């Protein structure tokens, strides 16, 4: 079964998309065409959206699902005339909160994502810059400023995990690739020994690692199953020998990996 889902907002659309994606993920038997439409902030834009929604309904043979965070009632009323099934996120959640808190909401567009109102903005930018500057062991002299240092074999998911934690949580995460030479020495590289309390290991199934490496360097020793199996086995032995917590990234999303790391290390997110 196929359905179209629209994430519509008169702001960035981040809230509508984030919540909508989470809800749609619960319906694994349905294939969704997902369309984000931010800054629908005029009646003219709203009427154009109605046409898009109706076209999708005709094409799919079923009503599109609409997740909206629209503040303007006029725009919401126009969209309500479409052939879509509307889920008004603000009305669904703010009304019960207003009742519980005995206070009226400001109904401000993009409140949580506004630079001028968001003290987390610079924390996020600094964390992303830190992750990029300290990626793949490129430099180690700033490890004293790191909240976390991810270690593991090449191409096991360290970089995307560091960047996600920076963007989502403001965590300053560095990463360091463990090489065959490191494993043969049977100990941590000297650059990491001083920061052992910040280390967390990532590992991966050898067949998955071989597939990823083959996309980068096909038919190379680096990408061979035998090499991948050796590196994964030895790095896991190193983690156990050094008492470094680690998880296998094969079957987890970057969101799940990041959350598990923060819980196991007891690191508090900087973005509140």
Swiss-Prot record:
Function: Bifunctional serine/threonine kinase and phosphorylase involved in the regulation of the phosphoenolpyruvate synthase (PEPS) by catalyzing its phosphorylation/dephosphorylation.
The organism of origin for this protein: Stutzerimonas stutzeri (strain A1501)
Residues that hold ADP according to the record: 152-159
NCBIfam families: PRK05339.1
Record-given protein name: Putative phosphoenolpyruvate synthase regulatory protein
Molecular function in Gene Ontology: ADP binding; ATP binding; phosphotransferase activity, phosphate group as acceptor; protein serine/threonine kinase activity
Family: Belongs to the pyruvate, phosphate/water dikinase regulatory protein family. PSRP subfamily.
Taxonomy, superkingdom: Bacteria
Pfam family, one: Kinase-PPPase
HAMAP family found in the cross-reference section: PSRP
Entry EC number(s): 2.7.11.33, 2.7.4.28
Catalytic activity from the UniProt record: [pyruvate, water dikinase] + ADP = [pyruvate, water dikinase]-phosphate + AMP + H(+); [pyruvate, water dikinase]-phosphate + phosphate + H(+) = [pyruvate, water dikinase] + diphosphate
Keyword terms of this UniProt record: Kinase, Nucleotide-binding, Serine/threonine-protein kinase, Transferase
């Amino acid at each position: 079964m196929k359905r179209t889902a629209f994430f519509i907002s008169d702001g960035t659309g981040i809230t509508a998309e984030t919540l909508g994606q989470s809800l749609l993920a619960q319906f694994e038997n349905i294939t969704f065409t997902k369309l984000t439409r931010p800054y629908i902030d005029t009646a003219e834009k709203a009427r154009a959206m109605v046409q898009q929604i109706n076209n999708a309904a005709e094409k799919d043979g079923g009503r599109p699902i609409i997740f909206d965070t629209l503040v303007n009632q006029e725009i919401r009323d126009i969209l309500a005339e479409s052939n879509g099934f509307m889920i008004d996120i603000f009305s669904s959640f703010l009304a019960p909160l207003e009742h519980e808190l005995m206070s009226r909401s400001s109904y401000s567009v993009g409140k949580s994502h506004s630079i001028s109102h968001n003290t987390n903005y610079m924390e996020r930018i600094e964390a992303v810059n830190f992750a990029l500057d300290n990626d793949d062991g490129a430099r180690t002299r700033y490890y004293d400023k790191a909240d976390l240092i991810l270690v593991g074999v090449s191409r096991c998911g360290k970089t995307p995990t560091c960047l996600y934690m920076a963007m989502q949580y403001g965590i300053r995460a560095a990463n360091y690739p463990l090489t065959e030479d490191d494993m043969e020495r049977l100990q941590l590289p000297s650059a990491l020994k001083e920061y052992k309390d910040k280390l967390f290991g990532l590992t991966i199934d050898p067949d998955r690692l071989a597939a990823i490496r083959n996309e980068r360097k096909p038919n190379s020793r680096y990408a061979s199953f035998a090499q991948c199996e050796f590196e994964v086995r030895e790095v896991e032995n190193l983690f156990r020998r050094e008492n470094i917590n680690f998880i296998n990234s094969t079957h987890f999303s970057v969101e799940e990996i990041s959350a598990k790391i923060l819980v196991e290390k007891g690191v508090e997110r900087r973005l509140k």
